[in-house]
Amino acid sequence: MSFKFEAEVRSAQGKGASRRLRHNGQVPAIIYGGNAEPVSIILDHDKVNNAQAHDAFYNEVLTIVVAGKEEQVKVQAIQRHPTKPKLVHLDFKRV
């Protein structure tokens, strides 16, 4: 099973900006590692939440398309809301 997500580069940083994203059905994330600089991104919450229900999401290499460029990543960390079935933030590491 392969996973491919479309992402936008995230320009607004901070707690307020993150809360606005989550309120609009999006989830903030970051891609880091490798020889490139870290990139803050925005993903669609429902697509990622549905994908993370599969065990393969945590073990396989994922593809994230950011500004027309494909990044090969693995999930490094996921932060979840303590009481709601919501994702709060994701960390991806380049492969």
UniProtKB/Swiss-Prot annotation:
* Source superkingdom: Bacteria
**One Gene Ontology molecular-function label:** 5S rRNA binding
User: Which InterPro entries is this protein grouped with?
Assistant: Rbsml_bL25/Gln-tRNA_synth_N, Ribosomal_bL25/Gln-tRNA_synth, Ribosomal_bL25_short, Ribosomal_L25_dom, Ribosomal_uL5_bac-type
Q: Which UniProt keywords apply?
A: Ribonucleoprotein, Ribosomal protein, RNA-binding, rRNA-binding
The UniProt entry's GO biological process terms, in alphabetical order, are: translation
* CC terms in the record's Gene Ontology section: cytosolic large ribosomal subunit
Under Pfam families, the record lists: Ribosomal_L25p
Q: What does this protein do?
A: This is one of the proteins that binds to the 5S RNA in the ribosome where it forms part of the central protuberance.
Share what the entry says about its subunit structure, partners included.
Part of the 50S ribosomal subunit; part of the 5S rRNA/L5/L18/L25 subcomplex. Contacts the 5S rRNA. Binds to the 5S rRNA independently of L5 and L18.
Q: Which HAMAP family match?
A: Ribosomal_bL25
Looking up NCBIfam families in the UniProt record yields: PRK05943.1 (NF004612)
| Family stated for the protein in its record | Belongs to the bacterial ribosomal protein bL25 family.
Q: What is this protein called?
A: Large ribosomal subunit protein bL25
The UniProt gene name for this protein comes to: rplY
